[in-house]
């Protein structure tokens, strides 16, 4: 198994995927990136069992194969390279040799078959939304989500999809944010609670991204697909509180203030 790839191109993709990897994995194999090579397509995956993300990279190769490479060690190694083509060669002695213009490096690898497979969604519903709109929705709500382990449903963002609009809600019982978009909609009504970690990953990737994101979801999992990248995560199980009950319906008091002045005064 052999392939050639740009050092900066690979590093950029791996740094994004590295955000999935936990510092306290229960399975040692999860400390690795999964490399799945199929000729000129290299699919790289990272997982913590709750969240799995994969990206497809274009490489120069005619081979096929699957290996698991130590994530932190590979990232640290790639950071030392200037932009240049790198040649990866998988040897029979359980090492992968990385050849650069400045020398060769050898990393031990594990059997890719040990890496857990991403969850396949059964009978999912699907909604499409522009990446920058989704990133804005996450930015405007995620900060209000709680951190209380005793109330897990409030530790994420509540997604409400309907044919009329998409609504995103977060609360920690002290503050509440509701963000609604009537310019995008779903084919049918759906509700689910997204955990913080995958939302933080999506927020960073999708900021300013005008690619369309396909959101697929069922009762237990959600999948976000865009631009050769796929993120699958487990949803938070439970019923979200009736947030509408705490939003005043008839409040005669209204204050209009310049945003910049208000921000300066409360800093």
For the regions a language model picked out, list residue spans one by one.
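Structural preference for solvent-exposed beta-strand-turn elements
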Residues: 1-267
């Amino acid at each position: 198994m052999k392939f050639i790839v740009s050092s900066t191109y690979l590093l950029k993709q791996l740094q994004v995927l590295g955000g999935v990897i936990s510092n306290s994995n229960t399975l040692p194999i999860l400390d690795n990136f999964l490399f799945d090579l199929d000729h000129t397509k290299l699919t790289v995956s990272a997982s913590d069992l709750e969240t799995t993300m994969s990206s497809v990279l274009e490489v120069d190769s005619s081979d096929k194969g699957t290996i698991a490479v130590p994530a932190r060690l590979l990232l640290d190694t790639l950071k030392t390279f200037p932009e240049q083509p790198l040649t990866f060669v998988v040897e029979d002695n359980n090492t992968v040799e990385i050849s650069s213009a400045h020398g060769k490096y050898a990393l031990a690898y594990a059997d890719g078959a040990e890496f857990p497979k991403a969850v396949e969604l059964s009978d999912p519903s699907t909604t499409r939304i522009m990446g920058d709109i989704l990133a804005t929705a996450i930015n405007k709500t995620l900060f209000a989500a709680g951190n209380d382990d005793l109330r897990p449903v409030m530790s994420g963002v509540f997604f409400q999809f309907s044919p009329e609009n998409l609504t995103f809600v977060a609360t920690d019982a002290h503050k509440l944010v509701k963000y609604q978009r009537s310019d995008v909609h779903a084919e049918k009504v759906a509700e689910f609670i997204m955990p913080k970690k995958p939302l933080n990953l999506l927020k960073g990737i999708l900021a300013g991204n005008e690619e369309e994101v396909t959101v697929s979801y069922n009762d237990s999992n959600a999948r976000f697909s865009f631009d050769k990248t796929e993120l699958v995560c487990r949803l938070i199980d439970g019923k979200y509180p009736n947030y509408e009950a705490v939003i005043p319906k008839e409040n005669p008091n209204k204050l209009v203030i310049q945003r910049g002045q208000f921000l300066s005064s409360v800093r």
